[in-house]
């Protein structure tokens, strides 16, 4: 059986947005490196007071490497949704496979790729938000709230995506189990 899963337009758009956000932020860091303060806030106490500062190279470079590794891994995984979507539907794949079950398996793999791409986009933007909050944490309370709300928003979107995936997968499996 051919494990190739076609790419939908929305998946291509998600991948393009993720690439733009990822490489756009790297370009932003390179261009604005001299304008970034030498010391960045790296830790706050429970009262919201700055406890520790770090040099920008020791803060941004390792975090950028972590983001790059996560980005590459998640993007590679998105090219192989069959490896991730190892559901019970695969046990139906025999020599006498009919198109009904084949289409269910393809829909599961398409859905899996979409959720992986959404996760990739959310993680890249979450890291970028954290970077920006570290760079521009000049004691502006509004900025800290925006960062907090952004992180909460990304978390809610990620949880909603996972729930959507779960319920959609159950619907597909229920409609194709005989």
Please give the residue ranges for each predicted region.
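Hydrophobic alpha-helical membrane-insertion segments
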Residues: 16-27, 67-75, 112-122
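Alpha-helical transmembrane segments
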Residues: 18-20, 55-77, 147-156
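Active-site and channel-lining beta-strand-loop segments
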Residues: 29-61
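Membrane-water interface of transmembrane alpha-helices
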Residues: 32, 72-93, 163-169
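Alpha-helical transmembrane segments and their immediate juxtamembrane interface regions
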Residues: 57-61, 105, 129, 135-178
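Hydrophobic alpha-helical transmembrane segments of integral membrane proteins
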Residues: 94-126, 156-164
């Amino acid at each position: 059986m051919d494990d190739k899963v076609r790419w939908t337009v929305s998946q291509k758009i998600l991948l393009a947005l993720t690439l733009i956000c990822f490489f756009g932020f790297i370009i932003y860091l390179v261009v604005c490196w001299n304008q970034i303060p030498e010391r960045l806030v790296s830790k706050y106490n429970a009262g919201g007071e700055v406890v520790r500062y770090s040099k920008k190279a020791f803060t941004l470079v390792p975090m950028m490497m972590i983001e790059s590794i996560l980005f590459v891994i998640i993007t590679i995984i998105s090219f192989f949704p069959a490896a991730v979507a190892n559901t019970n539907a695969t046990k139906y794949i025999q020599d006498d496979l009919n198109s009904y079950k084949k289409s269910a398996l393809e829909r599961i793999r398409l859905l899996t790729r979409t959720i992986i791409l959404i996760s990739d986009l959310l993680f890249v933007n979450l890291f970028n938000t954290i970077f920006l909050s570290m760079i521009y944490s000049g004691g502006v309370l509004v900025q800290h709230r925006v960062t907090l709300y952004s992180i909460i928003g990304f978390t809610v979107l990620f949880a909603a995506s996972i729930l959507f995936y779960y319920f959609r997968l159950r619907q597909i499996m229920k409609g194709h189990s005989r």
